Amino acid sequence: MPNSHWTPADIPDLKGRTALITGANSGIGYRTAQVLAEHGARILLTGRRPDALADAARRLRADVPGAHLETVELDLGDLAAIRDAAAPLAAGETLDLLINNAGVMDVPERRLTRDGLELTVGTNHLGHFALTAHLMPSLQRSSAARVVTVSAVAAAWRAGDLADLMSERSYRPMSAYAKSKRANVVFTQELARRFAGSAHRAVVVHPGSAVTNLQRHTSASRTGRLFVALASRTLMGSPDGAAWPSLFAATHPEVTNGAYLGPAGRDQTSGTPEPVRLPAGADGPDLGAWLWRESERLTGVTFPVPQT
């Protein structure tokens, strides 16, 4: 996968391709949508708040005149809303790129989604699990669909152990975040196994570190405040560079099914995307099968891609 000099300028013409990006109102998601639109892709811009979504659409049309763009209201913390948002697309749309980008982090107290799931894992993993399942008919209409899920360096933290997935025994904000990001990796590895033998690809990325709206809860957590304060001085880049792994995963012709991509720079904080080491045990088929079953149980969604 030669990529030492890759930049978004190397992205091929995407006319005729449709991409849905979650959390595209701002930050990494917005930049991802902008670059894909610049290369001709039709963009399905999703977000939870109608006002922020409309504002993002206005900005994108100004940034990319002539962009082929539609908006989809989507709350990843509401399973019924996910189903309803996906239904019209699943009924007849062809989806070539699904970029599972949205997320929350460092929620100071244990909160629940509308469906009674712990908010961080419920949004970052289970919401995207359900969305991907509901959109599978659209993805399968593509000749070579890609599902790109955005994880984080936190996936490798010891606190990311998936035992007590819903943090029912104890809750710590950054532990819940690490669990959700490890679940993103494990989910992608299992989806890649189920895509084996097809032209479809499941890819997981981490963006390094970037200052974005993802940190909006950190003011309430001392640990979160310290993490963001230190990282913003030393490690964090802009959403522009942080979008590169997602863009590379979505468009580079040599990206392989099951790849894990991150920045090539110092401590994987920034730089050109490259394959990086998976968190220990994250590609185990037993863990993948368990998380899949548990995710189906918690969401009530049956994923239409059978285990191989």
Regions inferred by a protein language model and the residue ranges of each:
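A short C-terminal helix-loop "cap" of Rossmann-like NAD(P)-dependent dehydrogenase/epimerase domains
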Residues: 167-168, 221-230
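Short, flexible, mixed-charge acidic loops at enzyme active sites
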Residues: 160-165, 217-222, 263-274
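Short acidic-hydrophobic sequence patches enriched in Asp/Glu that either
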Residues: 52, 223, 287
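C-terminal helical subdomain
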Residues: 180, 229-279, 283-289, 293, ...
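Rossmann-fold NAD(P)H-dependent dehydrogenase/reductase core
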Residues: 1-218, 298-306
